[in-house]
Amino acid sequence: MYRWINCYICPPMRKIILIVLMLAAGLSMKAQYPGYVVVADLVKFKTEFAAATQKTVSIKSDFVQEKNLSMLSEKITSKGKFWFKKESQVRMEYSHPYQYLMILNKDKVFVKDGQKENKISTKSNKIFQQINKIMIDCMQGTALNNPDFKTRIFENKNSSLVELVPLAKGMKDLFKTITVIVDKKDYSVTSIEMLELSGDNTIIRFLNKELNADIPDALFTVK
């Protein structure tokens, strides 16, 4: 199974870090984005984004992930299901072309890759502490004020684009930019693009989203 980032972290941690970064609303390969212009009213966007995320207590969706490798013309496509529930509970389950499970419950992480299982505490890893904070900020609507990123916001008729350029060393060593597309109807994330320093990029699209769905706590149990 291909691992997303070829850098300084052990393989399981590489995948977990990318997954958690999806909740940071979890952004840019170009200086400008075709079809987008700089947001007209930044204060209004931040206020409405914060209000919408505060009302969102859970998210359930399908996802499609595309991994584009700079050394290969072929892209790697994966599919699965995603769940989020306040406070700080995430379950991401890959079903195609391989089975992979990640559960994040506050400061505890559980990973199952085939028959291999691994448990990790975010308290023991500074990068993970930073990522965990980003996730919480996003769910609370305060991610746009995170000093660990330089932020720019663009918009078109139907969506907003948030470009995050990492400033903190841990994130700078992993990513050049992270781009999040937000639906203007409900301010939910429709896609995330992560551009690595190597030139590789990962795009994750969220489909069939259900906001404030009834999700049992048992889905996030870390034994």
Regions found by a protein language model. Give the residues of each.
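Short hydrophobic/aromatic-rich beta-strand segments that constitute the beta-sheet cores
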Residues: 63, 90-94, 109-112, 162-164, ...
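Gly/Pro-enriched, hydrophobic low-complexity segments
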Residues: 120, 144-223
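An acidic-aromatic
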Residues: 81-129
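Positively charged n-region of N-terminal signal peptides that target proteins for export
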Residues: 2-3, 11-16
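Short, solvent-exposed helix-to-loop capping segments enriched in aromatics
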Residues: 53, 130-143
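N-terminal leader/targeting segments and the immediate start of mature chains
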Residues: 30-64, 68-73, 218-223
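Amphipathic hydrophobic-ligand
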Residues: 74-81, 104, 200
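Sec-dependent N-terminal signal peptides
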Residues: 8, 16-25
